[in-house]
UniProtKB/Swiss-Prot annotation:
The keyword Nucleotide-binding applies. L-tryptophan binds at residue 140. Homodimer. The keyword Cytoplasm applies. It is found in: Cytoplasm. The lineage of its organism: Bacteria, Bacillati, Mycoplasmatota, Mycoplasmoidales, Metamycoplasmataceae. This is Tryptophan--tRNA ligase. Belongs to the class-I aminoacyl-tRNA synthetase family.
Length: 332
């Protein structure tokens, strides 16, 4: 039976967090035996932000090494750098001409991010890449014609646009693009800030105390858990009215490979101090082991990214050439 294909990328801005691991990377590791997987470091997407070249280079290698340390197997998963596969840019140009300015300017993420780019004199200089970002994302996806694309809630609208573009190409040019779906894991789909558990833990946030970074001192991470916001009830159970406690239970369940029900059972007669100690120790142990693996994998990042580039380019080139033949810019 042919395996289905999964594609996902992560921008090379900011430092990876525990939320990135639990919400995404952990699931990729579980799915790599079931799917043909293409996982990439989205360095081109990072260019819509202000960048420091030396920091960007460091982030790219760091993210790739962390993916490997978390358990991605380069024999099973194609791990590559987006900019290494030139087909992404050409595919974007083709897809850009299948969309309208109206469609792109209605994207919620564009409206949110562009509203924050205002100078002191009340003028704006919004990068055009911010507007066209969803078409590069669509190119990233359709080049590998996947069945499944795990995305966060903030990217669901972009995935819907990708599905719309695929449908349009299929109807217009008789192409065979899949309309990929996404999935949401049962536990840990969204890990929240430790200081404000109504907001997502994010690698782009300034909320340092509410965020656990995968490469930070495990002892510091333990202390952050100990100081995390809960509530005044002092009873441990998972409930929407208890976002802080629920968040800690989800972190524990995911790191210890237990169900939420099992996690609640473990802490049902415990107080919040005991809950935080249990979760804190789980986080500290996880980070200690992960960081040891990270050091081992960092040395082979360049080699693995180069191998991934070759494998990804083979698939991307094949699918792009087929599309170019269909639209008339390649001979059949």
């Amino acid at each position: 039976m042919n395996k289905k294909t999964l594609v996902s990328g992560i921008t090379s801005t900011g430092k990876l967090t525990l939320g990135n691991y639990i919400g995404a990377i952990r699931n990729f590791v579980k799915l790599q035996d079931e799917f043909n997987m293409f996982i990439f470091v989205a360095d081109l997407h990072s260019l819509t932000n202000e960048i420091v070249p030396s920091v960007l280079r460091k982030n790219i290698k760091e993210i790739a090494a962390l993916y490997l340390a978390c358990g991605l197997d380069p024999e099973k998963t194609v791990l590559f750098k987006q900019s290494d596969v030139y087909e992404h840019g050409l595919m974007q140009w083709i897809l850009l001409n299948q969309t309208t300015i109206g469609e792109l300017s209605r994207m919620t993420q564009f409206k949110d991010k562009s509203s924050k780019i205002t100078h002191a004199n009340n003028t704006e200089s919004i990068p055009s890449g911010l507007l066209t970002y969803p078409t590069l994302m669509a190119a990233d996806i359709l080049l590998y014609n996947p069945n499944l694309v795990p995305v966060g809630q903030d990217q669901v609208q972009h995935l819907e646009l990708t599905r719309k573009i695929a449908r349009k190409l299929n109807n217009k040019y008789n192409t065979k693009f899949n309309e990929p779906t996404t999935f949401v894991p049962e536990t840990g789909a969204k890990i929240m800030s430790l200081t404000n558990p109504t907001k997502k833990m994010s690698k782009s946030s300034d909320d340092i105390n509410g965020t656990i970074f995968l490469l930070e001192d495990p002892e510091l991470a333990y202390k952050k858990i100990k100081k995390s916001i809960t509530d005044s009830e002092n009873k441990v159970y998972h409930d929407p009215s208890k976002p802080g406690v629920s968040n800690l239970l989800e972190i524990y369940a995911c790191l210890e490979n237990k169900s939420l029900k099992e996690a609640q059972e473990i802490f049902k007669d415990k107080n919040y101090l005991e809950l935080k100690e249990g979760v804190g120790n789980s986080v500290k142990n996880f980070l200690t082991k992960l960081q040891a693996k990270y050091q081992e994998n960092y040395k082979r990042v360049d080699e693995i990214l180069n191998q991934g580039k070759i494998k990804a380019q083979k698939v991307a080139s094949y699918n792009l050439n087929n599309l170019m033949k269909k639209i008339g810019i390649r001979d059949k």
